[in-house]
Amino acid sequence: MASLFKKKTVDDVIKEQNRELRGTQRAIIRDRAALEKQEKQLELEIKKMAKIGNKEACKVLAKQLVHLRKQKTRTFAVSSKVTSMSTQTKVMNSQMKMAGAMSTTAKTMQAVNKKMDPQKTLQTMQNFQKENMKMEMTEEMINDTLDDIFDGSDDEEESQDIVNQVLDEIGIEISGKMAKAPSAARSLPSASTSKATISDEEIERQLKALGVD
C-alpha cells in the first residue's frame, strides 16, 4: 500500500513518458502498414477499372488513393515528431542527472572545506619541511664525520694496488724501473675518532641561516 502513495521521482515520470511514446510509435507504424496495404489494394482496383474502361470508377478510386497517400505521409511526420520528443526527453533526463551529480559534488566539497583548516594545513607543511631539513642536515653531518674517520685508511694500499696493476699492463721493464725508483713516504693524518655532537641549537641556527623558521 505504501508504494501506491509514494511520490513519483523524475526518473519515474520520464520512464512513463517514454513508455507512452513507444506505444504511440508502435500504433503509428501499425496504421501506416494498414494504409500501405489499402494503398496496394486501391492501385490494383484502379488498374482493374482501367482495363475494362471504367473512367468514372478510376477517378473516384484515384481520389481515394491520393487522400490515402496524404494520410500515410502524415504518419511519417507524426512518427518523426514522436521520435524527436523521445530524444528530447532523454536529453532532459541526462541533464537533470548531471545537475544532480554536480549538486552532490558541491555538497561534498563544501563539507570537506569546512573540515579543513588552511592555517593548520600550512603549519603542518612548514613543520614537515623544517623537520625534513633537520634530518637531512643531521644525516649529512654524520656522514661527513664517518668519512673523516674511515677515508684514507686504505688509501695507501689501494693506491699501490692501482699502480701495480697499471705497471703490469705497461710492461715488466718499466715496472722494474719504477721498482728501483725511491718511493715517497706519505704519512697519513690520523683520523679523529671523536664523534661530533650535533645539538638542536646548532641545527636551529643553520635552519634560520637558510631562511626556514
Curated annotation (Swiss-Prot):
Coiled coil: 25-55
GO cellular component, one term: nuclear pore
Tissues where the protein occurs: Widely expressed. Expressed in brain, heart, skeletal muscle, spleen, kidney, liver, small intestine, pancreas, lung, placenta and leukocytes. In brain, it is expressed in cerebellum, cerebral cortex, medulla, spinal cord, occipital lobe, frontal lobe, temporal lobe and putamen.
Entry-annotated residues carrying Phosphoserine: S199
Sites bearing N-acetylalanine, chain numbering: A2
Keyword Cytoplasm part of the UniProt annotation: yes
Primary location recorded for the protein, binned into one broad class: cytoplasm
Membrane topology: Peripheral membrane protein
Region of interest (Disordered), ranges: 179-199
Biological processes, Gene Ontology terms: autophagosome maturation; autophagy; cognition; endosome organization; endosome transport via multivesicular body sorting pathway; ESCRT III complex disassembly; late endosome to lysosome transport; late endosome to vacuole transport
Protein keywords: Acetylation, Amyotrophic lateral sclerosis, Coiled coil, Cytoplasm, Disease variant, Endosome, Membrane, Neurodegeneration, Phosphoprotein, Protein transport, Transport
Annotated compartments: Cytoplasm, Cytosol; Late endosome membrane
Span of the annotated motif MIT-interacting motif: 201-211
Pfam families per record: Snf7 (PF03357)
Effect of Q206H: In FTDALS7; cells expressing the mutant protein have large cytoplasmic vacuoles with an accumulation of the mutant protein on the outer membrane termed halos; cells with the mutant protein also have aberrant localization of CD63 and an increase in MAP1LC3A overall indicating a defect in the autophagic pathway
Subunit structure comment from the entry: Probable core component of the endosomal sorting required for transport complex III (ESCRT-III). ESCRT-III components are thought to multimerize to form a flat lattice on the perimeter membrane of the endosome. Several assembly forms of ESCRT-III may exist that interact and act sequentially. Interacts with CHMP2A. Interacts with VPS4A. Interacts with VPS4B; the interaction is direct.
Comment text on domains: The acidic C-terminus and the basic N-termminus are thought to render the protein in a closed, soluble and inactive conformation through an autoinhibitory intramolecular interaction. The open and active conformation, which enables membrane binding and oligomerization, is achieved by interaction with other cellular binding partners, probably including other ESCRT components.
Family, similarity comment: Belongs to the SNF7 family.
Pathological condition linked to this protein in its record: Frontotemporal dementia and/or amyotrophic lateral sclerosis 7: A neurodegenerative disorder characterized by frontotemporal dementia and/or amyotrophic lateral sclerosis in affected individuals. There is high intrafamilial variation. Frontotemporal dementia (FTD) is characterized by frontal and temporal lobe atrophy associated with neuronal loss, gliosis, and dementia. Patients exhibit progressive changes in social, behavioral, and/or language function.
Function: Probable core component of the endosomal sorting required for transport complex III (ESCRT-III) which is involved in multivesicular bodies (MVBs) formation and sorting of endosomal cargo proteins into MVBs. MVBs contain intraluminal vesicles (ILVs) that are generated by invagination and scission from the limiting membrane of the endosome and mostly are delivered to lysosomes enabling degradation of membrane proteins, such as stimulated growth factor receptors, lysosomal enzymes and lipids. The MVB pathway appears to require the sequential function of ESCRT-O, -I,-II and -III complexes.
Protein name as annotated: Charged multivesicular body protein 2b
Species classification: Eukaryota, Metazoa, Chordata, Craniata, Vertebrata
Name of the encoding gene: CHMP2B
